[in-house]
Amino acid sequence: MGWSWIFLFLLSGTAGVHSEVQLQQSGPELVKPGASVKISCKASGYTFTDYNMHWVKQSHGKSLEWIGYIYPYNGGTGYNQKFKSKATLTVDNSSSTAYMELSSLTSEDSAVYYCAR
């Protein structure tokens, strides 16, 4: 039996009004079912610790789903109950980077993921 694969496409967006605000995400990932993946979102153009970083999922043909947020200043998090056991949000303030780790991946996790300020 051949391997199955899960494709995760990562994009970034921001609600910021200043054009210099940028969020740069890691690239697309192709991973095996059951594996984990950690994706990154590097921020620039604003004070990283001043704003929540949100993560959103969009499966093909479906509406956006909010996964959760992290407040870089103190590491506080809030999760959509649906994703509480799937996603883990962390930050590295020294590099102004937010991370989302997705665990125990299945075909249901194949989607576009966004980070957003």
Swiss-Prot record:
This is Ig heavy chain V region 108A. The keyword Signal applies. CDD domains: IgV_H (cd04981). It comes from Mus musculus. It comes from the Eukaryota. GO terms for biological process: adaptive immune response. Keywords: Adaptive immunity, Immunity, Immunoglobulin, Signal. Pfam families: V-set. GO terms for cellular component: extracellular region; immunoglobulin complex. Residues 20-117 form the Ig-like domain. Transmembrane segments: none annotated. The keyword Glycoprotein does not apply. Residues 1-19 form the signal peptide.
